[in-house]
Swiss-Prot record:
Pfam families: LisH_TPL, WD40. Disulfide bonds: none annotated. It comes from Xenopus tropicalis. PROSITE patterns: CTLH, LISH, WD_REPEATS_2, WD_REPEATS_REGION. It is found in: Cytoplasm; Nucleus; Mitochondrion. One of its GO terms (cellular component) is mitochondrion. This is WD repeat-containing protein 26. Forms homooligomers. Identified in the CTLH complex that contains at least MAEA, RMND5A (or alternatively its paralog RMND5B), GID8, WDR26, and RANBP9 and/or RANBP10. Interacts with DDB1-CUL4A/B E3 ligase complexes. Residues 100-184 form the CTLH domain. G-beta-like protein involved in cell signal transduction. Acts as a negative regulator in MAPK signaling pathway. Functions as a scaffolding protein to promote G beta:gamma-mediated PLCB2 plasma membrane translocation and subsequent activation in leukocytes. Core component of the CTLH E3 ubiquitin-protein ligase complex that mediates ubiquitination and subsequent proteasomal degradation of target proteins. Residues 1-19, 34-44 have a biased composition (Low complexity). The gene is wdr26. Residues 1-65 are annotated as: Disordered. Keywords: Cytoplasm, Mitochondrion, Nucleus, Repeat, WD repeat.
C-alpha cells in the first residue's frame, strides 16, 4: 500500500497515495451506483495527515497507521455495499479517511450513468494517478466475452489510458447497437475505436455485431449482459485494474480477503474432507475453521466376511456405487453401496478364478470388470458386471503371467502384462491388437491421452509406452523394486509402494520425487495404496503391520492409523464419489469399510483412530 502524503500531480490533483486526510469533513456523500465504493469523497480535501489531529473536547486523535487506514477503507466499502451510507459518512468523517480519490469517484459515476464523453474526459485527470509509482504490475490477459483486452500492470501510462479508453468505447458501441442506433455505433467503431490502433482482432469481432438482427442476438454473441448496471459494473471492475488501490479500491475487496482467509484455513486443516464452498454465508467468521477427526473415515462401519481366504484386492467403481473384492478363494464379490446409509450388501459373486484374484480393474463406464491372478496365472477374466456373465477369458500362452491390467480411456481396449515379459493391448473380445516384447511388467496404468501406457518393471522404474508410434521413455527411477503404483485423477502425481521403503509420491510432469510418507511397513509384499478424499487431498495405504495408514498429501507423517485387521493389509480403496467412505482388504480374510465416527461411543472411535498431527 502507498505511504501518506504522496506527491500531488502537476494539475493540482490530490495525492494518490493517501486514503486519509487531516482536514475537517463537510457534507455527506451521495449514494453510489456501484461496485461497493462510495460515489463521493465525503466532502474531504487537503493533503495526507501527518500527525495527531484535534477532536472536539480538546482530545487528540491518534494518528492512524497505514494498516488502520486500509482497514477503515475496506470496512467503508463493505458497509456501502450493504447500503449503510450514513454509517459510512460518519466513519469517514470521524477517521478523516476517504474511500477513493475524487477523480476516481467522478469517473465511476460517469461510467455507471453511461455518460461516455464525460468518462473519457475523466481519463485525462486520471493520467497522473496511473503514472503514480504505486500503479504497479504486468500485462495479463483478461477473460470475458467482451474483454479480450489485456489489463495492465507495468505498461506505459499512454498505453494504459488507451486500453481504458478502448474498454469505454467498446461498451458505448455495444449499447448503441442494443438501442438500435446503428449509425451512431458505426461512427464509434470507425472514428473512435479504430483510430486507437489497439486490439484490431477485437475490432473485427465488434464489427461483426453490426449484423445482429436483434438485441438478444447481440447479447448472446457478445456474451454481454446488455445495457445497464450489470455490464457497467463489470466494465468498472476491468477499468479498476488499471488504477492503483490508493485511487480506487478493488471491488468487494473485504469479501475477497475474508474468502482467501477461509480458504487458507481449510487448506491447512488436516482433516478437511468436504467440498469447498466459496460462499462466506456458509461459514462462521467468528472462529477459526477446524474439522474434527470424528468427521474423517477412521471408524469401522462394516466388516465384510463373505470371503473364506485372504483378500488380495479391493476397488470401488468409478461412480462409487459398487465395490469389487478379489480373494485367494478364487472369487470376486461385487458389493452394492447404499447411497444413503453407505452400508454395503453382497450383489454378485463371480467364480472360477483358479489361481485366485490379485488385481481388478473397472472399465471407465463401470459395465465391465477385469480380474487378474497371481504370478502363475496365464489368464484374465472380463466380466459383464450388470449380468454377471463372463464375456471373455483371455490367454495367449500357458507360459504367460498376466498379473496386471489397465483400461484405455475409450473403454474399448485394455493393456495387460506380467513379470515374464508379456505386455499386450487387447480388445473386449480378448483379441491381441499390439504387443511389446521383453517388458517385465509389475503394474500398469493408461493415461488420459489414450495413447500412453505407464508400466513399472523389474528394473525399478516406470516407463511410458506409446502403442501408436512404438516409442517409450523413462519417467520414474527408484532404487528399490516398485511393487505397485497408482495415478492421480489429473494425471500429474504417481503414488508408489516401494519395497522396503514405503510410499513415495512422484510428480510425473517434473519427474521428481515429491515426498516420502512415513510409518508404513512395506517389505516385498504387493501392497496397493490410493489417492482419496475430496479433491484427492489424502493418501491411504495398507501395511504389513496390520494397519491402514492415512496421510494428508502434503504431510509426511500419518494423520491416522486405523487398526482392526489382524494380518497384512494388502489394498486400500477410497470411494471416488463419497469422500467419507474407504475400504481395506487384508490377509485376515476380511474387508473393512471405514467411515466417520457414529454420534455415540466416541471412546471406541478414539481406540480405532489414533491420530498424529504433523
Amino acid at each position: 500500500m502507498q505511504a501518506n502524503g504522496a506527491a500531488a500531480a502537476a494539475a493540482g490533483e490530490e495525492p494518490a497515495g493517501s486514503g486519509c486526510l487531516s482536514a475537517h469533513n463537510g457534507e455527506s456523500s451521495e449514494p453510489a451506483h456501484s461496485n461497493g465504493v462510495l460515489s463521493s469523497n465525503n466532502g474531504l480535501s487537503g493533503t495526507g495527515s501527518t500527525g495527531p489531529t484535534e477532536q472536539p473536547g480538546g482530545r487528540k486523535k491518534k494518528r492512524l497507521s497505514q494498516a488502520d487506514e486500509d482497514v477503515i477503507r475496506l470496512i467503508g466499502q463493505h458497509l456501502h455495499g450493504l447500503g449503510l451510507n450514513q454509517t459510512v459518512d460518519l466513519l469517514m468523517q470521524e477517521s478523516g479517511c476517504r474511500l477513493e480519490h475524487p477523480s476516481a469517484t467522478k469517473f465511476r459515476n460517469h461510467v455507471m450513468e453511461g455518460e461516455w464523453d464525460k468518462a473519457e474526459n475523466d481519463l485525462n485527470e486520471l493520467k497522473s494517478l496511473v503514472h503514480s509509482p504505486h500503479a504497479v504490475a504486468a500485462c495479463r490477459p483478461s477473460s470475458g466475452g467482451s474483454g479480450s483486452e489485456h489489463s495492465p500492470t507495468s505498461c506505459p501510462t499512454a498505453d494504459v489510458i488507451r486500453r481504458m479508453k478502448f474498454l469505454l468505447l467498446q461498451q458505448k458501441y455495444l449499447e448503441y447497437l442494443e438501442d438500435g442506433k446503428v449509425l451512431e455505433a458505426l461512427q464509434v467503431l470507425r472514428c473512435e475505436l479504430t483510430p486507437l490502433k489497439y486490439n484490431t482482432e477485437r475490432i473485427h469481432v465488434l464489427s461483426g455485431y453490426l449484423m445482429c438482427s436483434h438485441a438478444d442476438d447481440l447479447r448472446a454473441k457478445a456474451e454481454w449482459e446488455g445495457k445497464g448496471t450489470a455490464s457497467r459494473s463489470k466494465l468498472l471492475d476491468k477499468l479498476q485494474t488499471y488504477l492503483p488501490p490508493s485511487v480506487m479500491l478493488p471491488p468487494r475487496r473485504l469479501q475477497t480477503l475474508l474468502r482467501q482467509a477461509v480458504e487458507l484455513q481449510r487448506d491447512r486443516c488436516l482433516y478437511h474432507n468436504t467440498k469447498l464452498d466459496n460462499n462466506l454465508d456458509s461459514v462462521s467468521l467468528l472462529i477459526d475453521h477446524v474439522c474434527s477427526r470424528k468427521q474423517f473415515p477412521c471408524f469401522t462401519q462394516q466388516v465384510l466376511t463373505e470371503h473364506c481366504n485372504e483378500v488380495w484386492f479391493c476397488k470401488f467403481s468409478n461412480d462409487g456405487t459398487k465395490l469389487a473384492t478379489g480373494s485367494k478363494d478364487t472369487t470376486v464379490i461385487i458389493w452394492q453401496v447404499d447411497p444413503d446409509t453407505h452400508q454395503l450388501k453382497l450383489l454378485k459373486t463371480l467364480e472360477g478364478h483358479a489361481y485366485g484374484v490379485s488385481y481388478l480393474a473397472w472399465s471407465p463406464d463401470d459395465n465391465y470388470l477385469i480380474a487378474c491372478g497371481p504370478d502363475d496365472c496365464s489368464e484374465l477374466w472380463l466380466w459383464n458386471v450388470q449380468t454377471g456373465e463372463l464375456r471373455t477369458k483371455m490367454s495367449q500362452s500357458h507360459e504367460d503371467s498376466l498379473t496386471s491390467v489397465a483400461w484405455n480411456p475409450d473403454g474399448k481396449r485394455f493393456v495387460t502384462g506380467g513379470q515374464r515379459g508379456q505386455f499386450y493391448q487387447c480388445d473386449l473380445d480378448g483379441n491381441l491388437l499390439d504387443s511389446w516384447e521383453g517388458v517385465r511388467v509389475q503394474c500398469l496404468w493408461c493415461l488420459s491421452d489414450g495413447k500412453t501406457v505407464l508400466a513399472s518393471d523389474t528394473h525399478q522404474r516406470i516407463r511410458g509406452y506409446n502403442f501408436e508410434d512404438l516409442t517409450d521413455r523413462n519417467i520414474v527411477q527408484e532404487d528399490h523394486p516398485i511393487m505397485s503404483f497408482t495415478i492421480s485423477r489429473n494425471g500429474r502425481l504417481a503414488l508408489l509402494n516401494v519395497a522396503t521403503q514405503g510410499v513415495h509420491l512422484w510428480d510425473l510432469q517434473d519427474r521428481v520425487l515429491v515426498r516420502k510418507y512415513q510409518g508404513v511397513t512395506q517389505g516385498f509384499y504387493t501392497i496397493h495404496s490410493c489417492f482419496g478424499g475430496h479433491n484427492e487431498d489424502f493418501i491411504a495405504s495398507g501395511s504389513e503391520d496390520h494397519k491402514v495408514y492415512v496421510w494428508h498429501k502434503r504431510s509426511e507423517l500419518p494423520i491416522a492409523e486405523l487398526t482392526g485387521h489382524t494380518r497384512t493389509v494388502n489394498c486400500v480403496s477410497w470411494n471416488p464419489q463419497i469422500p467419507s467412505l474407504m475400504a481395506s482388504a487384508s490377509d485376515d480374510g476380511t474387508v473393512r469399510i471405514w467411515g466417520p465416527a457414529p454420534y455415540v461411543d466416541n471412546q471406541e472411535f478414539e481406540e480405532e483412530c489414533s491420530s498424529m498431527n504433523s
